[in-house]
Amino acid sequence: MASSLRAAISKIKRDDVGQQVCPNYVMLRSSVTTKVVRNVVEYQIRTGGFFSCLAMLRPLQYAKRERLLGQRNLERISTRDILQTRDLHSLCMPTPDAPMSNHQAATMRELICSYFKVDHTDGLKYIPMDERYSPSSLARLFTMGMAGLHITTEPSYKRVPIMHLAADLDCMTLALPYMITLDGDTVVPVAPTLSAEQLLDDGLKGLACMDISYGCEVDASNRSAGDQSMDSSRCINELYCEETAEAICVLKTCLVLNCMQFKLEMDDLAHNATELDKIQMMIPFSERVFRMASSFATIDAQCFRFCVMMKDKNLKIDMRETMRLWTRSALDDSVVTSSLSISLDRGRWVAADATDARLLVFPIRV
């Protein structure tokens, strides 16, 4: 992994708008193209294979990756076989996958310092004032991205979206990950939504305002997706205790911050609607939306379970079997093209891969 990653990093180049490009490393953007038709913005996002990069989540590989990038020494992590609380803090740190502007860095830092009552020195630990860094870190993939999201057409390993995220353009309202049921062709939510303020007022002390669930396999052991979904939600909640509270709250915090950043970016689009046909405005916005759109990568239920399981609560993960499922995927080294359409009208947002609709997101007000 270390040698292949080093080879991938050596291939990094910059495209015509100064963004880092590496076709074989999914954490580095490949390309984004934009088309504006009336008030609908359509994005074509091409990324490398996702599954081959999940191996980096293993502490040993993650430590190698961090040392290779010269960010910090994580040798102690490599001696353990499960992620600890402080590892989640590392996962939430920005990574140099897509640069952000100083204005974006300052905005994110202000959000952190204001809402979580920390001084600017601590804020610098999370959002460095450096254009090499981006809020699009592993945390974004494992918060927004773990919300179900894609149904893959791979017949040997299908997933169902059992929850979704939405951010209303008119108010700071989040539809957090929640389980859904299908009534014919209609997606019916089975849990309420909460505002970001309500989440942050929770004091980050637990799951009182947030019930975490995640995706599941279809027809695993001949059990319905709904039954698996309920079991998944229970598993996460059972992980909560005094020892795991901080780590779970880190995930919760990142979810709130990612959604708040998404809201700011959507506001920026709404306030500049009359300028959408000007390519000068669309280029920088495309880069920001790419970081949000990367959350639509296919993700695995076992991956999230692995991330949040700080202590062994008799929920054992067969990592050998898990990695076998990941590595056998035909998507390992292929280029995946996804589409994201955002309309300024009231209605639904659709994320699709090729011609198949994979996720329907409905802007909601509480």
Swiss-Prot record:
Listed name of the protein: Protein sigma-NS
InterPro entries: Reovirus_polyG_pol (IPR002507)
Subcellular localization(s) per the UniProt record: Host cytoplasm
Name of the encoding gene: S3
Residue span of region Important for ssRNA-binding and formation of complexes: 1-11
Additional comment: There is a strain variablity in the inhibition of the host integrated stress response (ISR). There is a correlation with the abilities of the strains to prevent upstream PKR activation and EIF2S1/eIF2-alpha phosphorylation.
Keyword Iron-sulfur included in the entry's annotation: no
Subunit structure as annotated in this protein's UniProt entry: Homooligomer; in presence of RNA. Interacts with protein mu-NS; this interaction allows the localization of sigma-NS to the viral factories. Interacts with host G3BP1 (via C-terminus); this interaction induces the relocalization of G3BP1 and other SG proteins to the viral factories periphery.
GO cellular component terms attached to this protein's record: host cell cytoplasm
Similarity comment: family membership: Belongs to the orthoreovirus sigma-NS protein family.
Its biological purpose: Protein that binds to ssRNA and participates with protein mu-NS in forming the matrix of viral factories, which are large inclusions in the host cytoplasm where replication intermediates are assembled and viral RNA replication takes place. Plays a role in the inhibition of the integrated stress response (ISR) to escape from host cell translational shutoff. Participates in the disruption of stress granules (SG) through its association with host G3BP1 and mu-NS.
Pfam families named among the record's database cross-references: PolyG_pol (PF01518)
GO molecular-function terms, A-Z: RNA-directed RNA polymerase activity; single-stranded RNA binding
Record keywords: Host cytoplasm, RNA-binding
